[in-house]
UniProtKB/Swiss-Prot annotation:
Subcellular location field: Cell membrane
Protein name per its UniProtKB record: Putative transport protein YrrI
Family matches, as InterPro entries: AI-2E-like
Family statement: Belongs to the autoinducer-2 exporter (AI-2E) (TC 2.A.86) family.
Membrane-topology descriptor: Multi-pass membrane protein
Gene: yrrI
Taxonomy of the source species: Bacteria, Bacillati, Bacillota, Bacilli, Bacillales
PANTHER family, sorted: TRANSMEMBRANE PROTEIN, TRANSPORT PROTEIN YRRI-RELATED
Transmembrane region(s): 8-28, 37-57, 77-97, 165-185, 220-240, 243-263, 269-289, 311-331
Species this protein is from: Bacillus subtilis (strain 168)
Length: 353
C-alpha cells in the first residue's frame, strides 16, 4: 500500500534535487562560463547544421527518387540553398545596416511625434483618470527604449558577424556531410542505442518527424513568401525601412494566428509618424497577408500536419508568450507537438504494461 506514495515522494525529491543542482550551477557562472563558451562554440553550429540538414534531406531524397544520382542531388540542393543565402546576405546586409542605422538615429524624432500625438490625446481626454495618462506615457517610453536597444543590438550583431565567421563557415561543410552520410549516421545511432530502447526510440522519432517535419518546412516557406510580399509592398508604397519591416513580418508569421498582427506593430508605429495614408497601407497589407496565409498558403503548403485543435495551439501560444515572450510563442507550437507525441507514447507504454 505504501509503495506508490514512497515512489511518488522519491520522484519528487529527485526532481527537486535536479532543479536545485541547475540553480546552483547557474549561480556559479564564474566557474562554468569558460565551459559554456566551449560548448556554445561546438554545439550552436552543430544544432544549426542538424536543423538545416533536416530541412534539406526530404528535397534531396525526392530528387534522388526522380532518378538523379544521390551525390548530384545533394550538390544541387546544397548549391541552391547556400548560394541563395549567400546572395541574399551579400545584397541585403549592407541595405539592412543602412536602414537600421537610419532608424536608430530617427528614434528620437519618432518619440517626439508620439509625444505630440499623446499631447493631442490628453487635450481631448481631460475626463480620463490621471493614472491612465501616466500608464500611456510610461508605455510609450518603454516602447522607445525597447526599440532603441533592439536596433542597437542588431547593428552591433551584424557589424560583429566577422567574429563568428569561422564558426559559421563550418556549417555548410557539416550540412553537406550530414546529408551525404545520413544512412551511416542512422546506423551509428542505432548501434549506440541500448537494445531495449531501439524499437520505441525509432517509433518516437518517426512520430515526431511525421508531426513536425511538414509543419516546420511548410511554415518556413510560408514565412519567406509573406515576408517578401510585405517588404515589396512597403517599398512600393514608399514606407521607410521596407527590408526591416518585411523581415519582422516574415519572422513573426511563424507564430500562428497572432503572428501577422505582432509583425504589423512596428510598421504601424512608423506609419503613424508619416500620414493616415501610410497607416491605411499597412492595415490593408496586413489584412491581405492574413487572408493569403489563412486561405491560400497555409492550407496548400502546411495543411493540417500538426493534427492539434486550434484551442490547444492558442493556449500553447499564450503559455509560451508568458514564459519567454516572442521567442516562447515561436517555440510553443513545436514544443507542444513534441509533448503530445511523448504523452501518446507514455500512455501506450502504460497500457502495454
Amino acid at each position: 500500500m505504501l509503495q506508490k506514495p514512497v515512489q511518488l515522494l522519491l520522484w519528487v525529491a529527485i526532481c527537486l534535487l535536479v532543479l536545485l543542482t541547475v540553480y546552483v550551477f547557474f549561480m556559479l557562472d564564474m566557474l562554468w562560463s569558460p565551459f559554456w563558451l566551449v560548448i556554445k562554440t561546438i554545439f550552436i553550429p552543430l544544432i544549426i547544421s542538424i536543423f538545416i540538414s533536416y530541412l534539406l534531406l526530404p528535397v534531396t531524397e525526392w530528387l534522388h527518387g526522380k532518378g538523379l544520382p544521390r551525390t548530384l542531388s545533394i550538390l544541387v540542393i546544397y548549391v541552391l540553398f547556400f548560394g541563395g543565402i549567400g546572395w541574399a546576405l551579400y545584397k541585403g546586409v549592407p541595405v539592412l545596416i543602412v536602414q537600421l542605422t537610419d532608424l536608430s538615429e530617427n528614434i528620437p524624432m519618432f518619440a517626439e511625434t508620439y509625444n505630440g500625438l499623446l499631447l493631442h490625446v490628453h487635450n481631448h481626454t481631460d475626463d480620463w483618470p490621471d493614472g491612465m495618462h501616466h500608464r500611456i506615457d510610461k508605455m510609450i517610453r518603454q516602447t522607445e527604449a525597447f526599440f532603441a536597444g533592439t536596433i542597437e543590438g542588431a547593428i552591433s550583431g551584424i557589424r560583429n558577424v566577422l567574429d563568428y565567421f569561422l564558426i559559421a563557415a563550418t556549417i555548410p561543410f557539416l550540412v553537406f556531410y550530414m546529408v551525404k552520410d545520413i544512412e551511416l549516421m542512422k546506423k551509428t545511432v542505432w548501434y549506440l542505442t541500448p537494445k531495449s530502447w531501439r524499437k520505441r526510440g525509432s517509433a518516437f522519432l518517426r512520430d515526431v518527424d511525421d508531426s513536425l517535419g511538414d509543419y516546420i518546412r511548410g511554415q518556413l516557406l510560408v514565412c519567406l513568401i509573406l515576408g517578401v510580399i510585405a517588404g515589396i509592398s512597403f517599398w512600393v508604397f514608399g514606407l521607410p525601412y521596407p527590408l526591416i519591416l518585411g523581415l519582422i513580418s516574415g519572422v513573426t508569421n511563424v507564430i500562428p494566428y497572432f503572428g501577422p498582427f505582432i509583425g504589423a506593430v512596428p510598421a504601424l508605429l512608423i506609419a503613424m509618424t508619416i500620414s493616415v495614408k501610410a497607416v491605411l497601407v499597412v492595415v490593408i497589407t496586413v489584412f491581405i497577408l492574413q487572408f493569403m496565409e489563412g486561405n491560400i498558403l497555409s492550407p496548400f503548403i502546411v495543411g493540417r500536419s500538426l493534427k492539434m485543435h486550434p484551442v490547444v495551439i492558442m493556449l500553447a501560444l499564450l503559455a509560451g508568450g508568458e514564459l519567454a515572450g516572442i521567442v516562447g510563442m515561436i517555440l510553443a507550437v513545436p514544443a507542444t507537438a513534441v509533448l503530445k507525441v511523448m504523452m501518446i507514447h507514455f500512455l501506450r507504454m502504460r497500457t502495454e504494461h
